[in-house]
Amino acid sequence: MSQNGDKDHELIQGKVKSKTEIEDSVILDQDTLQGKGEEKTKLDELIRWEAEKNDLLKLIDNVGNDEVFTTVETCQRMLDDLFPQDHEVWSNPDLKWLNPCDKNGVFFREIALRLDKGLAKVIPDEYERKKHIMTKMLFSIDLTKFTSLMVRRTLYYCIKANKRKTSEDEGCAIANGAWFNNECGNVVKPYKEHYFDKQGKNKKCKFCRTDEKFKYQQSSSNEKYAYDFIHLNPNEYESYFKTNFGVMKFDVIIGNPPYQLANNRGGDAGDGNGANPIFQEFILRALELQPKYLAMIVPARWINSSEKVFLKFRAKLQKSNGFKGINIFFDSKHCFPNRQIKGGVCYFNWQNGYEGQTLITTKSSKKGKQEEIETYKRDFFAPVLNNTEQVIFRKKFDTTFIKR
């Protein structure tokens, strides 16, 4: 996060305007967001530094408690660790990439840069190569209407993917809007709703378990936080992906899903304060699509937590195994400098059909001092003992260190 421009920094952090106020004002003013003439818009307040010398994705750290934005540095490190430069994903033009929980476009921006380099010999023409990457390889499902604007701005340089240059307005999308025939491009604006059971006093969404009376259903909010990817019935997959992308099969699924839905007691993203964890639902949904690779950055507490939701989650994961590598950071600030996430965070590379040992890398800190990184291989899931649950890291696991 840049330290320049306190006013803008406070605005972006939501100290001057709340998350809801920023999101709602941007969404309601979409028709004027192009900034014609001298007109100033709400989105301009968030992005005006981008045209100068600053990186928008380094400026915006977080717009709310429910979604933790991935920093550019963390995204780059995650890609370096899970998919090294010589990995096949960077030189295969036929792969389809899906981010089912996009927030700011950081993953696909960094991925596009690497694909542009890796596909140089396969598609020598620079224009055709970039067009192929953007139109045939990268597909995004956004979390909110607000984040869909950010993602398109990041990937296409404009909130309308088919925006062309006009005499009245100098702004235009990538390739002068010629690569797409619609405003969204390959970035889906969410449109699903929560599904509440009609029976019982405390009605909860059957997909994410949020309460019908909670803030996500307030009439004053333009966002319902009914994340499309986990609010789809299995029989909707084909029509959803075919309608929005014209693609049915995804080879690489990657992202940083929302960690949980905040609660009325002030639960924050990842703090475990009684809120409903939902990141595991994104992982399970992704596995249902049977990609070749799955990579996500999520809270690490699922690994050995005794919470019922994570016991069930691990039981389902054991059926697929496939964990080729996992990096665990017991201090979440290694990945998110401005966030404290209970139990740390981890990112992993799941590979379809992989049955070998898992390369485990751990990093811990003590009293603010970074300790050495520890790397080793072992079976990710321990053998079943006396018909009890298979567990990961059967010896002591805490938020500081793993003892083997």
From Swiss-Prot:
Pfam families: Eco57I (PF07669)
Catalytic activity of the protein: a 2'-deoxyadenosine in DNA + S-adenosyl-L-methionine = an N(6)-methyl-2'-deoxyadenosine in DNA + S-adenosyl-L-homocysteine + H(+)
UniProt EC number: 2.1.1.72
S-adenosyl-L-methionine keyword on record: yes
Gene Ontology biological process: DNA modification; methylation
Keyword Methyltransferase attributed: yes
GO molecular function list: nucleic acid binding; site-specific DNA-methyltransferase (adenine-specific) activity
InterPro entries with a match to the protein in the record: DNA_methylase_N6_adenine_CS, MethylTrfase_TaqI-like_dom, SAM-dependent_MTases_sf
Keyword terms of this UniProt record: Methyltransferase, S-adenosyl-L-methionine, Transferase
Stated family: Belongs to the N(4)/N(6)-methyltransferase family.
Protein name (Swiss-Prot/TrEMBL): Uncharacterized adenine-specific methylase MPN_108
Organism this protein belongs to: Mycoplasma pneumoniae (strain ATCC 29342 / M129 / Subtype 1) (Mycoplasmoides pneumoniae)
Upper taxonomic lineage: Bacteria, Bacillati, Mycoplasmatota, Mycoplasmoidales, Mycoplasmoidaceae
